[in-house]
Amino acid sequence: MDLCQKNETDLENGENNEIQSTEETEPTCTCPDGRSEKNHVCCLLDISDITLEQDVKAEEFIIGTGWEEAVQGWGRTSPAACIWPRKLPKKARVGEGACSDCLVCLNLAHRSLETKPPTEGGPEKDQSSPSQTQAAPQGPSTASRAISNICFPTYFRTEKKSLQIKEFIWCTEDWAISDSSRGKALRNPSGGAHRGLSIPGPLTSRALLVLPPLKASLSNALDVLGKKSKNSFLQSEEKVLSVEKDGCLACAYGLKTADGKGEKRPSELAKHTVVNDTPSSPSPAARTSLLTDPEQCCLHWSLLSEKNLACPSDSSNVRYLAALQLLQKRGVQNYKSKFQAKDPRPPVITQKAKQENSPQMLETKVFTRPLLPSLTHRKKKIK
């Protein structure tokens, strides 16, 4: 029992000794004045003071205007450096002073020119202007006079205008005249060709510069019509030839082939030209009004077709168009008689006859309705 108690007491003493040794080995902050406990608090207070000063400076910098920072270094430059533009010096023109690039001088020159009323004597004003500018600045010292003579330009020219402004003014004047002439034409609708031609020539020539060029001659327009009609006729012929034979077509239309080669004559081409839409030849008064009124030409030019341009003036052209219309009417009648003669017949009882008649039904249906083929379904019986 005694041995156990001694061992326990020895263990407790050893633990106490270890605790004391660890407390002694802990680092302690020592101050030169000998204040070890207050050293940590003093360091924290110093850090807080430094951060406070920095925060105050930052707030002052944000709230302040920054004028002091901007003014730093101004003593090294000239006092008028902020007024002068940063550009290369240009050569002085005739009639301008040496300091024409100075903004203050230019503004003062503009104001002096605006306040002075314009006079008729051009060269006299130029000669008198240097003496006026020299006599204007009267100061106690000669330096101010010399500065005024150098800085202020003697004469500033403002007579130049850009080309765009001139063109715009010219166009507005022309259109104003054309509007007035149009109003006169509307008030007098019964006026003939002589009234339409009373508008001066230069106005019409200027107005027609805006329009696209007219065709050179009427024969060219008729050639264009002939080419269009030929193309449409060839397309229709190709569609019809894919259904029926050439010989039956020639007999039904009443056409004849030259030399048996299938070449169509001009009379045959004339049958299928579309001439119903061609207007009658307008009067010369209408032509002159179209040419003399520039606004109508500009607004409605895109609506005019090539058929309107092809206005036949000679009697031979009128006869040619009338003959084309008659030939077209005859061709339509031949079409009608052909389709009435080829009505579908009642089908035959045999199956072969039904198969032979089915493509004929297709042909008649294609042409009686608008040019779209109708679909048919053939049923085959399984034997």
From Swiss-Prot:
Residues 10-26 have a biased composition (Acidic residues). It comes from the Eukaryota. InterPro entries: DUF4529. Residues 262-271 have a biased composition (Basic and acidic residues). Residues 128-141 have a biased composition (Low complexity). Residues 1-30, 114-144, 262-289, 341-360 are annotated as: Disordered. This is Uncharacterized protein C16orf46 homolog. It comes from Macaca fascicularis (Crab-eating macaque). The lineage of its organism: Eukaryota, Metazoa, Chordata, Craniata, Vertebrata.
